[in-house]
Amino acid sequence: MKNILEKYAKLLCHYSLELKQGEKLYISTTTLAQPLVREIYREATKIGVHVEVAFSFREQGKILYDNAPDSLLRQEPTFHKLAISEFDAYLNIRAPFNLNETNNIDKAKRKIRTEALTPINNIYFERTADRNAPNGLKRSLCQYPTQANAQAANMSLEEYQQFVFNACHLFSDNPEGEWLKVRAQQQHIKEYMDKVSLVRYKADHTDISFSVEGRTWINSDGQTNMPSGEVFSGPVEDSVNGKVHFTFASIFMGQDVQGITLWVENGEVVKWDAEVGNKVLDEVFKIPGAKFFGEVAIGTNYNIQRTTRNILFDEKIGGSIHMAVGQSYKQTGGKNQSGIHWDMITDMTESGEIYADGTLIYEKGKFLI
């Protein structure tokens, strides 16, 4: 295990975050991820990087929501804001204790907290729009395998560890080399899509189109997410029209939502339905900006072939597409603003098609270009 975590740490420090001597790295995670944090701290320190770690403990979020007055929920987390505003690199390691920890908290309190964090999220999206800009923030999101995620994926912890490490190419003798291959393959797709104006996703119960004219497609190659394997952009906000059905379950703040269908007119979600969790959608679409799309994407990681109820992996499934309501990514040219960014995914391997300016470029989970 130590050997694989050493490889993981080196991949994150050198490839994903491209850390350099004199930089400041902010790590946010739970105490469960301590074994990986130790190796990252070791590797970053060798480079000459100043590291600060924010560990959260079991049920910290629930304790806050259960006990804090509204005035406290409206306060911004001081150090988190400082780090997001001023540090050079940010690594968020997901390592949950319990995926259902905050399921039963008061919805009004959740909304207050979401709105309070919006200004920090805006700083985050602004700084991560271009990691190479003078005030850019290099960021990466990764996973440390825990029992909670293993149970959600219907796997043993050992099986889940194998799944996570395989998705990151950590069993390769040269993980960074594998990700450089991914980068090259996806760059071809990115350059093709950058010349496209109108995109159409078509599958069972789905027929939705949108403009990406003037927008940029991003080659997500394992730097901002580890694992990665997707190309994504931001649709022109008022151009999305049609109906889209998401075949994979989605999780919103610990709540399970299945069989989501959205009807969209001139960019705005005008009707919604879910086989499970429709009330969650009712609450989500009350959030400012949530009725408009911030992202459209295509998953390309064929090392991920099953859902695990974890969006970091599920949205990358080779042969899938996803769309996110809420906040746009600045680097795509997207302009939608919201306190949320929620990805919803559908399988394209059975009957899926993608058209670019009327040309079929993707069929049954595979690119034709």
For the regions a protein language model found, what residue spans apply to each?
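Active-site bordering "gate/hinge" segments
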Residues: 1-241
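Dual-mode signal for accessory low-complexity, basic/Gly-rich regions
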Residues: 271-335, 354
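Intrinsically disordered terminal and processing segments
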Residues: 322-369
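Short polybasic amphipathic segments
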Residues: 198-201, 260, 270, 350-360
